[in-house]
Amino acid sequence: MKTYIIHYTKLEDRKNNILSFLSNTDCDYEFITDYDKEEIEGNKYYFADEEKFNDKIKNLWDSRIHRFRIINPAEISCTIKHILAIEKIAHQKENIGLILEDDAIPIENNFVDKIQQLIDTAPDNWDSIFMGAGCGIDFMNQKLRESRLINERFAQVKHPSTNCAEAYLLKKESAKRIYDSIIPFQLVSDWELAYQFYKLDMNVYWAIPPLFYQGSKSGEYDSTLR
C-alpha cells in the first residue's frame, strides 16, 4: 500500500519527523510537493465561485455561519496537493492508497500493522477510512453519537463525514470517482472532501480508536493554513 504525504516544502522539520517513523517500516511512500502556496497562480484546480460555494455549504453545514469566502493560498495549496494524491491513487496498481498530511503523527509505533488490521476487518463497502483524531476527542464523541457503530473498530459516519484530513485510506475506484468530480474546487481540503463524499454517496468510516493525531492541533507544530 503506497503512502502519499501532503507536504509544504519549507517545513523541513515535518518532513524529517515523517521520515523518522516511515524509515522503520517497509512502506512505499511519496511526498506531494508540487503547488506550494507560492506556486499556485494560474492553477486549474481552484475557482472562487460564490454560487457553487454556497450550494456545497447548504447541503452539509449552516450557511448562516459559513458564508462565502475566497480560501487563502495555503489552503488552496493544501487542497491541490490532496487532489494530486487522490489522482495518484486513482492511477496506481494497488487497490488502496494512504494519504497523510505532513503533521500527522502515529499514536503507536506499530501503526502499519494497525492499518492492515483495519483493512482486513473493514466492511466490504468502504470507500474511505479516516484514521486521525482530527478536531479532537470532543468532536469525535459528538459525531460518533450520531453514527452507526459497526463493531469495536469502526463507525459509519453521517455526512459531512471528514474529521480533518491528516490520515485516511482511499480505494482506487473511489479515488477515480472523486478525482473526476472535484475539479474545480471551492472549499478547503477536508470540507471539499466531505462534500464529494456526500455528492457521490460514498461510505465513509472512522477508525476507533484513531491511529494518528495532528501535530498542528496538539501544539507540536504551528498551523500554516491560517
Can you describe what each PLM-predicted range is?
Residues 1-100, 104-226:
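An acidic/histidine-cluster motif and surrounding catalytic segment
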